[in-house]
């Protein structure tokens, strides 16, 4: 398997771009971490999405496939649709749903597909992961830091600091 060296992420919201930077380096693309962080789109409330990382990778000339299990954005009946039809579904959905984050995510996936990205709905399995590892391809996966570190959910205090609170907090990272 291709060795991947990942730098320490500069702050709590840059794990995605930091991981993407490591993948770039493993494939010989030498970009400063700060540049990747500056160029990847971030959500208003911090952090990024796989699709924003994918758009950046497409712009850098990579082939990008996202396996999604996000039922807030994708309906299971969309599995197997041609990419252009999936793109139209994402855009049509924005007319019926009011969430600003969902709207932004749908538009980003539409752009991702238009720029040549592929969205798949394959069931997560060891065999799926192994199919990438057998081809010496890295896999980036989104995982909440709250889950990863088994920490309490958190919210931001008046000074922007993280306050851990299992009742009032939200998953972070």
Model-inferred region functions:
Residues 1-74, 82, 101, 107-110:
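Active-site nucleophile-adjacent alpha helix/oxyanion-hole segment immediately C-terminal to the catalytic cysteine
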Residues 39, 86-94, 99-173:
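Active-site-adjacent substructure of cysteine-protease-like catalytic cores
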Residues 76-83, 153-154:
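Short secondary-structure transition/capping segments
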């Amino acid at each position: 398997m291709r060795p991947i060296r990942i730098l320490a992420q500069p702050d709590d919201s840059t794990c995605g771009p930091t991981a993407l930077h490591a993948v770039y380096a493993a494939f010989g693309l030498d970009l400063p971490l700060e540049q990747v962080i500056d160029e990847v789109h971030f959500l208003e409330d911090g952090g990024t999405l796989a699709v924003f990382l994918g758009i950046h990778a497409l712009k850098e000339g990579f082939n990008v496939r996202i396996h999604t299990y996000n039922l807030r954005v994708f309906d299971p009946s969309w599995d197997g649709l041609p990419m252009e039809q999936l793109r139209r579904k994402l855009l049509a959905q924005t007319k019926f749903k009011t969430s600003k984050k969902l709207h932004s995510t749908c538009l980003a996936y539409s752009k991702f597909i238009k720029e040549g990205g592929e969205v798949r709905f394959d069931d997560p399995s060891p065999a799926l992961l192994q199919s990438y590892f057998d081809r010496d391809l890295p896999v980036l996966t989104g995982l909440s830091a709250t889950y990863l570190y088994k920490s309490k959910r958190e919210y931001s205090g008046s000074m922007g600091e993280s306050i851990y609170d299992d009742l009032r907090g939200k998953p972070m990272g």
